[in-house]
Amino acid sequence: MTQKGSMKPVKKKKTEEPELEPLCCCEYIDRNGEKNHVATCLCDCQDLDEGCDRWITCKSLQPETCERIMDTISDRLRIPWLRGAKKVNISIIPPLVLLPVFLHVASWHFLLGVVVLTSLPVLALWYYYLTHRRKEQTLFFLSLGLFSLGYMYYVFLQEVVPKGRVGPVQLAVLTCGLFLILLALHRAKKNPGYLSNPASGDRSLSSSQLECLSRKGQEKTKGFPGADMSGSLNNRTTKDDPKGSSKMPAGSPTKAKEDWCAKCQLVRPARAWHCRICGICVRRMDHHCVWINSCVGESNHQAFILALLIFLLTSVYGITLTLDTICRDRSVFTALFYCPGVYANYSSALSFTCVWYSVIITAGMAYIFLIQLINISYNVTEREVQQALRQKTGRRLLCGLIVDTGLLG
């Protein structure tokens, strides 16, 4: 009896953890896993205090401290929402604010337009190499692309259409082209062909869950040079895929080592590769495209090419309509470089500035489209081209525009 009585306290122990309380609209779980409130966004930031102290005392600030400050700001920048405050990705904000400002400033004078329109690609390339070097995902370029489409269409409706040179049919064609671009981008943003691990029992993940897991993986590896952002994406997939991974190849040990992905714990099939930015393997991976913030692989390559083609056609058509309105009786090519009186009024100056901005963006997209067509004709992917250049096994043709890898025919 005494033994049974002594075991009673053991039975009373609770093994189940208490359920988490629901979050109010201003509460959230921060990157440390603790409950926080948006009202305390300016409180208890040791890294920011240290940075201000070092700035006041004219001392140098370590890059790691700057990264921690930016991570803290990014984590605390939230808006109240149902069931908890939602995080706002700060990389989407600069295009929304700076693009209209730059374009309006560029329309004040011809020289200002030259300076601004020259500096915009330079700043975009600088930001690209900065994020590419750190192997981070960013919504900056996706935000820039979508907002550019919307803002160019807005300027067209406000400044070009009222002049009476654009008919209803032409406006309808341009509008349909814009919607087709958005549909193609939506298709290209879907699963590019992620590989699944047969040994994993995880269920399929949605695109939003995959993006969330990728962000968690990035937060875990920030500040550690050379760390890959696989994070919690290992052994996970966005789609149940029977072609996900192959068995161990029967070739040489070197070949088996090359095909094995230590991050995803699977054997990659031919032409698949692990994306260090997305943190997962992709079938027939071509490249990671910052304009869609996703990889381009087997499943979305056609949609990516289609989006580029529709964008080029729509952009050229919109540029032609605008120049025909503000620079009458001149060819499109002549009006680009010689349009007398275009800066006489602000409306035509803004339209002309937006035309040149569209020309710059269109030229960049045309280059990407041309490279894609060349790679398709040579039956190679962009990753295979870059790998051949690094290993010095490829031959440059046509001033480097074409690269013959010598691997696939």
Swiss-Prot record:
Organism: Homo sapiens (Human)
Lumenal compartment residues: 107-109, 158-165, 324-331, 375-409
Keyword terms, alphabetized: Acyltransferase, Golgi apparatus, Lipoprotein, Membrane, Palmitate, Transferase, Transmembrane, Transmembrane helix
Membrane topology: Multi-pass membrane protein
Protein name in UniProt: Palmitoyltransferase ZDHHC23
Chemical reaction(s) catalysed: L-cysteinyl-[protein] + hexadecanoyl-CoA = S-hexadecanoyl-L-cysteinyl-[protein] + CoA
Keyword Membrane belongs to the record: yes
GO terms assigned for molecular function: protein-cysteine S-palmitoyltransferase activity
Transmembrane intervals: 88-106, 110-132, 137-157, 166-186, 303-323, 332-352, 354-374
A Pfam family the protein falls into: DHHC
Subunit structure: Interacts with NOS1.
Enzyme Commission number(s) of this protein: 2.3.1.225
Keyword DNA damage: no
Record topology, Cytoplasmic segments: 1-87, 133-136, 187-302, 353
One Gene Ontology CC term in the entry: endoplasmic reticulum
Segments for region (Disordered): 215-255
Free-text function comment from the UniProt entry: Palmitoyltransferase that could catalyze the addition of palmitate onto various protein substrates and be involved in a variety of cellular processes. Palmitoyltransferase that mediates palmitoylation of KCNMA1, regulating localization of KCNMA1 to the plasma membrane. May be involved in NOS1 regulation and targeting to the synaptic membrane.
UniProt remark on domains: The DHHC domain is required for palmitoyltransferase activity.
Family, similarity comment: Belongs to the DHHC palmitoyltransferase family.
Residue numbers annotated as active site: C289
Subcellular location: Golgi apparatus membrane; Golgi apparatus, trans-Golgi network membrane
GO BP annotations, alphabetical order: protein localization to plasma membrane; protein palmitoylation; protein targeting to membrane
